[in-house]
Amino acid sequence: MMIYGLIACLIFVTSSIASPPITEDKSFNSVEVLVSLFRDDQKDYTVTSQFNNYTIDTKDWTIHT
């Protein structure tokens, strides 16, 4: 059983090393995903990020993370 865990770990590590880095225009962050999954009827919101701090604004509410 221990050998299967070691093989799985090696496969995971080598696949993560071999994958190219994600470009900025194709990346996403968890804040945008959460807002897009759990938004209600309000369709207009903006996500602003600066130095890994996020602000999500709508006309009715604001979230600072």
From Swiss-Prot:
Keywords: Early protein. Belongs to the poxviridae C13 protein family. This is Protein C13. It comes from Vaccinia virus (strain Copenhagen).
